[in-house]
Amino acid sequence: MCIRDRIDIKKLIAYSSVSHMGYVMLGISAGGYLSIEGAIIQMINHGITAGALFMLVGFLYERRHTRNISSFGGIKITMPRYAAIFLFTSFASIGLPGLNGFVGEFMILMGSFNSYKVLTSIAAFGVVLAAIYMLWAYQRIFTGPISNEKNESLKDLDIRETLSIVPLVLLMLFIGIYPSYIESFVIQEAGFISETIALFKDIK
């Protein structure tokens, strides 16, 4: 699974992005209204969470000029605000209920099960795997004692960085609590795509 101590944090997020797009493809291929609506919402939510994660990795790279997991450890001691936001964003990425990542994934799984029972079951197991490797990475980077003296002088997020990431964090929370708001924007498109797929199936 390409998970090693010296793995690049940015690559880990990229692998996670591929996983999220797999859910999107499952939802679209199922062709149902609910699964397609979930796929559209998943793409929107993925843009928010992945964008935030890449920003956070960029902030860390500016300070240490490395993205290898083995170069870190215990940095929540010196960067508590950064650690809290990274954990929150990781929870959103793996689909914790109450955050934006849960909405699309749940709709895709529910809408795809009747069409692809086996694939949907595998996808549901993938949610667990995603949680494992994201939390594994968090543990290696942030928890425990500081394992590298270069990390002892790391500065926490400044005002500019905080203001740039907070809007994305608020979106993760808002969409997770009020999913109906974003559903109102995609409901028409989801219906059109679902009807088009059904039409092609009938022609076939």
Please state what every model-predicted region is:
Residues 5, 58-62, 110, 139, ...:
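Membrane-water interface at transmembrane helix exits
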Residues 6, 33, 37, 63-66:
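Helix-loop interface residues and adjacent transmembrane-helix termini in multi-pass membrane transporters
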